[in-house]
Amino acid sequence: MSMPLHQISAIPSQDAISARVYRSKTKEKEREEQNEKTLGHFMSHSSNISKAGSPPSASAPAPVSSFSRTSITPSSQDICRICHCEGDDESPLITPCHCTGSLHFVHQACLQQWIKSSDTRCCELCKYEFIMETKLKPLRKWEKLQMTSSERRKIMCSVTFHVIAITCVVWSLYVLIDRTAEEIKQGQATGILEWPFWTKLVVVAIGFTGGLLFMYVQCKVYVQLWKRLKAYNRVIYVQNCPETSKKNIFEKSPLTEPNFENKHGYGICHSDTNSSCCTEPEDTGAEIIHV
């Protein structure tokens, strides 16, 4: 009876994932309604301007249909790479490995479920080993293993059979050893040990060895079952990768402190509708030598 050894608890249920997907869809619908209101306001404003009286030779404004909704809504959003939902206060996004782009963020609960199903502790893409912090639940909060009714019946029958078998083996060994001890006393009195004594001695040795092997195998199975129960009631928290967290801080710092002045005297970029060029400051200290 083979059973998986490593299992990790704190698994998010399908209801939690479906609720998170429902919240993300609700947010998308609200965002689309807001965009439609913005487009309608823009259309009414442009029609009022055209009715106010513009010369017929003037160029007509660009059609509103040319604007896409993706240009109004933000194109880059932090989403979970497993459930493709955004993070919130209840389930924030973490950066557990060196992956970048759309694979950079993941939910703690989604990652725990993936770790349990895949039985691995490293990223399948960048092969970075996750930084984990484990702790056991209090004993009063332990949960039963998720097993089918057939598996539970097999375990109960196995335990019952093992208890009966161990009792029979111990009783048989006790009887054989007692009889053997009596024959040894009789042999010491007569000075002769008959062949039944040696036969019983061999049977006792074989029974004792078989009982030890039986106990070892069954204890090993029960130890594995105990480890499985212990792992099921263990909570594992995956921490952020130190390198990615520092990188995120450095990437966000220039966005929070924009530089509006050209302090170093570098070239200033001018953009136009048709062309864009950069002009560099002239070097007034240079001298032209005619040969």
Curated annotation (Swiss-Prot):
> How the protein is affected by changing residue 114 to A?
Almost complete loss of ebolavirus restriction and IL7R degradation
According to its UniProt record, where is this protein located?
Golgi apparatus membrane; Endoplasmic reticulum membrane; Cytoplasmic vesicle membrane; Lysosome membrane
Q: What is the effect of changing residue 83 to S?
A: Strong loss of catalytic activity
| Tissues in which the protein is found | Broadly expressed. Present in immature dendritic cells (at protein level).
- The enzyme's E.C. designation: 2.3.2.27
Signal peptide positions are none
User: Mutating residue 123 to S leads to what result?
Assistant: Strong loss of catalytic activity
Keywords from the UniProt entry? Adaptive immunity, Cytoplasmic vesicle, Endoplasmic reticulum, Endosome, Golgi apparatus, Immunity, Lysosome, Membrane, Metal-binding, Phosphoprotein, Transferase, Transmembrane, Transmembrane helix, Ubl conjugation pathway, Zinc, Zinc-finger
Compositional bias annotation for Low complexity: 50-72
Question: From start to end residue, where is composition biased (Basic and acidic residues)?
Answer: 25-39
- Catalysed reactions, semicolon-separated: S-ubiquitinyl-[E2 ubiquitin-conjugating enzyme]-L-cysteine + [acceptor protein]-L-lysine = [E2 ubiquitin-conjugating enzyme]-L-cysteine + N(6)-ubiquitinyl-[acceptor protein]-L-lysine
Listed transmembrane segments: 157-177, 197-217
Superkingdom of the source species: Eukaryota
Main localization category: Golgi
Residue ranges for the region (Disordered) are 22-72
| Residues that, per the record, bind Zn(2+) 2 | 97, 99, 123, 126
Q: Where are the zinc fingers (RING-CH-type)?
A: 72-133
**GO function terms (MF aspect):** MHC protein binding; ubiquitin protein ligase activity; ubiquitin-protein transferase activity; zinc ion binding
Q: Name one GO cellular component term.
A: endosome
The free-text function statement in the UniProt record for this protein reads: E3 ubiquitin-protein ligase that plays several important roles in innate immunity and adaptive immunity. Mediates ubiquitination of CD86 and MHC class II proteins, such as HLA-DR alpha and beta, and promotes their subsequent endocytosis and sorting to lysosomes via multivesicular bodies. Possesses a very broad antiviral activity by specifically inactivating different viral fusion proteins. Targets and ubiquitinates cytoplasmic lysine residues of viral envelope glycoproteins with single transmembrane domains leading to their lysosomal degradation.
Q: What is this protein called?
A: E3 ubiquitin-protein ligase MARCHF8
Species per Swiss-Prot/TrEMBL record: Homo sapiens
Q: Which gene encodes it?
A: MARCHF8
